[in-house]
Each structure stands twice: as C-alpha cells, then as structure tokens.
A protein has these predicted regions:
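C-terminal membrane-associated helical module and adjoining short loops/tails
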Residues: 244-355
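"…together with the soluble PPM/PP2C metallo-phosphatase catalytic core" -> "…together
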Residues: 1-267
Length: 355
C-alpha cells in the first residue's frame, strides 16, 4: 500500500518544494519587469503586487510530473491514460501561456476566449472528454456528438471561473488546493492514477504558493495572475474529467460538478446577473461571492476562510457520494466546519449592523 502511494507522495513533495523555492525569484523578476497588479476601485489590495506567481506554480507542477515520467512512473498507466495525462499537461501549458500573455499585454476578452476554446478542443481530441451526463428522472446519458462542445465549455468555463474567484489573497490557490486534494482522493478510490498523479502535484504546488500569497497579518507578496488562475482552472477541469467522469457510474459523472461547485456556481450566478442587467458577461464588477461577503462586513481573511470551508464542504459531500467507506464521516466533519463558518460570518455581519 505504501509502495503504491510513493509516486503521488513524490509528485506532491517535488511540486511543493519547487514552488516554495522559485516563488521569491519569480516575484523579484515580476517587480523588476514592472509586471504588477495595480490597485483600483474593483480590487481589494492597496499597493502594486507582482502578478506572475503562476509561473512558479506551473514550473513546480510540470517539473514534478516530468520527474515522475523520467522515473518511469507513467509506466503504471495504460497508453490511453498516458495520452490523457499529456493532454491535460500540455493543455494546461497553453492555458497558462494565454493567461501569461494577458498579464503582459492585456489581451481582449473575446480573443482570450477564442484561444481557450481552441485549446480545449485540442484537449478533447486527445481523449480529455466528457462522454456522459446525468439528467434528473432520466439517469446517465451518452452525449455522442455533443461530447465535444460540452467538454470544451467545461474546460474553458472552469478556467475562467477560477480566474474570477482570484480576487482575495489566497482565495484561488486555497480553493484549488482543496479541490485538487478531493480529486486526488476520489481518483485513487476509483483507480484512476493518471488524474491522481496530476492532482497530487497540483495540490502540492498550490499549498506551497500560499506561503507567499496568503499572509494573515499582512498583504500577499505575490499574485498568481491570469496565467496561474487559467492554468489551475483548466488543470482542475481536465483531471476531473480523466479521473472521475471516466468511471462510468452515475455517481462518478456528477462528482466533478460537486467538487468544483464553488467557482462554478459563482461564475454562473455572475454571468446570469450581468446578462439580466443587459451587460456583457465579460465586464468586470464586484458581484462575486468574495466581494459580497466583504461588502456585508466580513473581513477579507474571514471571507477567504468561509469560502475555503464551503469548498471543503462540497468536497466532503463528493467523497460521501463517491461511495467510499468513510465518505459519510468526511461529509459530517465537512458539514460541522461549514456550520461553524456560517456562524462566524453571521456573527460578524450582525456585529457590523449593530455598530
């Protein structure tokens, strides 16, 4: 059992170590080149901050996977699974490049979206595919020709959803770390090592990045930028497809939507609100969940912790729904944490209203 876990432990540890060591270097380069996120009325920070931290997350995750490959650990995968792992890795690289180009050159929204749809389509071609969905009162449905557009929408949609929640220090990295760990556990339970290997590396990189991106007593030293957020979002969406949806059961088909419910529901809510008001869905505003929590009187730090708890809660429900033996226990613990977080938020809002 321990021997079987070694590739995943090594992937996690290598990625975390590389991100921990390279982030200060990347930060210095970003400041020297002037690649910084400047304060504005829509943003929460007050001072310019380097915004290319995604470089270190990508380097750590990619290097960990390459080392695992050189050590021969991809040999545990059947050939189609190896294609899928490279499809997610290379697709993540291209999404990272799109975001990094946006960090440098401020690309138009429609141009970014077109490039993302093309890359997501290429990922579908190499086997990163949603082939089934579950419908109420119908059950599991084979998508057939609809597999391509639905997969492309999922991959590009989650990438943008993670980018949109990257509005408070540590938020996107922490949510991504929790989601990646949940996908790691479910993928191992469902015997999907390809997704588990990427999830292990991704979660390690995200947790190490929090060392510089989430400071309880002072502002973040560096932001991940669009490059990092797009990379995390695409990779999470990709591994949820190859690691969970590929297991053809009703439970497996709906698990990705539960695990990634926080960024997904936030994005859908904001898009429909903008369209309802006659606005472009690409126009930035302050309607995201983290904006609403802060506006209600919750501190930025507690808003982040609340969304962490929410992500952990839906993840625990996914573990319970997956059918694993301890799933009910995980869900109970996650629910208790969520209830406590709700009480803390309610208490802070109440104190603010009475002051």
């Amino acid at each position: 059992m321990v021997g079987e876990a070694i590739p995943f432990i090594v992937a996690f540890s290598l990625s975390a170590s590389i991100v921990w060591l390279t982030t200060p270097i990347v930060r210095s380069i970003g400041i020297r080149l002037g690649i910084v996120d400047k304060p504005s009325s829509r943003k929460m920070h007050k001072e310019p901050v380097a915004r290319i931290g995604g470089v270190s997350i990508f380097l750590g995750t990619a290097a960990a996977l390459l080392i695992c490959w050189r050590l021969g650990w991809f040999g545990i995968l059947p050939t189609p699974k190896e294609y899928q792992i490279w499809g997610v890795t290379i697709g993540g690289l291209l999404f990272f490049a799109i975001g990094l180009a946006d960090d440098f050159f401020d690309l138009p929204a429609i141009g970014r979206l077109i490039l993302q749809l093309i890359v997501a389509g290429l990922a579908w071609l190499v086997g990163v595919r949603i082939e089934f969905i579950t419908l109420p009162f119908v059950g599991m449905v084979n998508l057939g020709l609809l597999s391509c557009p639905i997969t492309v929408l999922w991959l590009a949609g989650i990438a943008n959803a993670v980018n949109w929640i990257d509005g408070l220090d540590g938020l996107a990295a922490g949510v991504s770390a929790i989601a990646a760990l949940i996908i790691l556990i479910t993928s191992l339970f469902m015997e999907q090592p390809a997704a588990a290997l990427i999830a292990a590396a991704l979660s390690g990189g995200c947790l190490a990045f929090l060392r510089y991106n989430f400071k309880p007593d002072r502002p973040a030293e560096i932001f991940m930028g669009d490059g990092g957020a797009y990379y995390l979002g695409f990779t999470l969406a990709g591994i949820s497809v190859i690691g969970v949806v590929k297991t053809v059961t009703t439970a497996a088909v709906i698990l990705p939507y539960i695990i990634l419910a926080v960024p997904l529901v936030d994005a859908i809510t904001v898009i429909f609100t903008r369209l309802w008001r006659g606005q472009s869905p690409f126009v930035a505003d302050k309607r995201h969940l983290h904006h609403r929590l802060v506006a209600a009187g919750v501190s930025k730090r507690h808003a982040v912790f609340f969304i962490y708890a929410l992500t952990l809660w839906v993840g625990s429900l996914a573990l319970a729904f997956s059918g694993m033996t301890a799933g009910g226990t995980y869900a109970a613990i996650g629910t208790l944490i969520m209830l406590y977080s709700c009480w803390r938020v309610w208490r802070r809002v109440k104190l603010r209203n009475h002051s």
